[in-house]
Amino acid sequence: MATYTTSDFKPGLKFMQDGEPCVIVENEFVKPGKGQAFTRTRIRKLISGKVLDVNFKSGTSVEAADVMDLNLTYSYKDDAFWYFMHPETFEQYSADAKAIGDAEKWLLDQADCIVTLWNGAPISVTPPNFVELEIIDTDPGLKGDTAGTGGKPATLSTGAVVKVPLFVQIGEVIKVDTRSGEYVSRVK
C-alpha cells in the first residue's frame, strides 16, 4: 500500500486515519523558533463526516486510502437507497442515506455525480456544482421589488429551500450553486 509523508500533504489528499478514510481540507507547514517542525492539518473523515484538527511531526508517514472517485449518473431512488450507474460499463451502485447526506436535495434524474467508493461501496456523493431547478413555492413579488439586498425563501422542485431575489416568481427555473446552496441566476 502506498504511503504519504507530510511533505506530500495538500488539500484533497485522501489517507487512512484510525482505520477510516480521511481527506485533507487544509494544511499548513509550521516551523516554530524552538522545537521540531510540524504540519498542522484539518481533516474530514469520509464515513462519519467529522472534521478534526490534527498535527503531524515533520516526516511522519500515513497510509494512502484505497478510495476511488467515479463519475456516475444518478438513476433513481427507492425506499432506502439511491442508485447510480456508470455511463460506460452500466454497472449499478447503491448509496444509502448516510452516503448521500445533503446531496439529496440537489439530485436530479440523469445528473452526473462524483461518487467516492471505499471497499467497493459508496461512502459519499458529490452532486454537480450547478443545478437548474423550478421554483414551486415562494412569496409573490410586489410592484417596486428590485434586485437589491432583499431576498425571500423559495422552495424548489427537489424540496430544497433557497434565498432568491424578490423579482423571482413561482414556475421560473433558476440556477443554484450546490456547494453553497445559493441562487446564481434565472435560466432563460
From Swiss-Prot:
Q: Which GO terms describe its cellular component?
A: cytoplasm
PTM per UniProt?
A: May be beta-lysylated on the epsilon-amino group of Lys-34 by the combined action of EpmA and EpmB, and then hydroxylated on the C5 position of the same residue by EpmC (if this protein is present). Lysylation is critical for the stimulatory effect of EF-P on peptide-bond formation. The lysylation moiety may extend toward the peptidyltransferase center and stabilize the terminal 3-CCA end of the tRNA. Hydroxylation of the C5 position on Lys-34 may allow additional potential stabilizing hydrogen-bond interactions with the P-tRNA.
The UniProt keyword set, sorted, is: Cytoplasm, Elongation factor, Hydroxylation, Protein biosynthesis
Q: Where in the cell is it found?
A: Cytoplasm
Give a GO molecular function annotation for the protein: translation elongation factor activity
Domain of life, per UniProt, equals Bacteria
Q: Tell me one Pfam family matched here.
A: EFP_N
Biological-process GO terms, alphabetical: peptide biosynthetic process
Location (main, coarse): cytoplasm
- Give a yes or no for keyword Protein biosynthesis in this entry: yes
Q: In which pathway does it act?
A: Protein biosynthesis; polypeptide chain elongation
**Positions bearing N6-(3,6-diaminohexanoyl)-5-hydroxylysine:** K34
Family annotation (SUPFAM superfamilies): Nucleic acid-binding proteins, Translation proteins SH3-like domain
Q: Which family does it belong to?
A: Belongs to the elongation factor P family.
Instruction: Write down the NCBIfam families for this protein, in alphabetical order.
Output: efp, PRK00529.1
**What this chain does, per the record?**
Involved in peptide bond synthesis. Alleviates ribosome stalling that occurs when 3 or more consecutive Pro residues or the sequence PPG is present in a protein, possibly by augmenting the peptidyl transferase activity of the ribosome. Modification of Lys-34 is required for alleviation.
The entry's protein name is Elongation factor P
This chain's source organism reads: Pasteurella multocida (strain Pm70)
Its organism's taxonomic lineage begins at: Bacteria, Pseudomonadati, Pseudomonadota, Gammaproteobacteria, Pasteurellales
